[in-house]
């Protein structure tokens, strides 16, 4: 039982990027996909997908370009995502990159404004 507690502690210490990488590695190792249950649930809902005129409720905020003030943009990215300094720097320098997925319209607008105020070029999809 102590081994399980140790694993929980180690997993809790992972950054978001490290957790995503771990997920990908486990998917490959076990031959499964973490997205499959979501696709099945969406297919079961069925009727919701049949109405194409619905308004978009989830948005993706993409950092298109960091601009000249990279340090300010890195600070904003850290505040928005909770990433560490190195991960935020890598995200900013690797633009275009997704900063936030599944954001509400208001949240996406706030993130876009904050990043643009810091000097970045941002797209909301």
Swiss-Prot record:
Keywords: Ribonucleoprotein, Ribosomal protein. SUPFAM superfamilies: ClpS-like (SSF54736), Ribosomal protein L7/12, oligomerisation (N-terminal) domain (SSF48300). GO terms for cellular component: cytosolic large ribosomal subunit. Homodimer. Part of the ribosomal stalk of the 50S ribosomal subunit. Forms a multimeric L10(L12)X complex, where L10 forms an elongated spine to which 2 to 4 L12 dimers bind in a sequential fashion. Binds GTP-bound translation factors. Forms part of the ribosomal stalk which helps the ribosome interact with GTP-bound translation factors. Is thus essential for accurate translation. GO terms for molecular function: mRNA binding; structural constituent of ribosome. InterPro entries: Ribosomal_bL12, Ribosomal_bL12_C, Ribosomal_bL12_C/ClpS-like, Ribosomal_bL12_oligo, Ribosomal_bL12_oligo_N_sf. NCBIfam families: L12. This is Large ribosomal subunit protein bL12. Belongs to the bacterial ribosomal protein bL12 family. One of its GO terms (biological process) is translation. Pfam families: Ribosomal_L12, Ribosomal_L12_N. The gene is rplL. The lineage of its organism: Bacteria, Pseudomonadati, Pseudomonadota, Alphaproteobacteria, Acetobacterales.
């Amino acid at each position: 039982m102590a081994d399980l507690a140790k694993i929980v502690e180690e997993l809790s210490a992972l950054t978001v990027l490290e957790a995503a990488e771990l997920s990908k590695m486990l998917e490959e190792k076990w031959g499964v996909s973490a997205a499959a249950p979501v696709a099945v649930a969406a297919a079961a809902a069925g009727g919701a997908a049949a109405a194409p005129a619905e308004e978009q409720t989830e948005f993706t905020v993409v950092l298109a370009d960091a601009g000249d003030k990279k340090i300010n943009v890195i600070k904003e990215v850290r505040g928005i995502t909770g990433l560490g300094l190195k991960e935020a720097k890598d995200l900013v320098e690797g633009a275009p990159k997704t900063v936030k997925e599944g954001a509400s319209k208001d949240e996406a607008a706030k993130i876009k404004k904050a990043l643009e105020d810091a000097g970045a070029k941002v797209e909301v999809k």
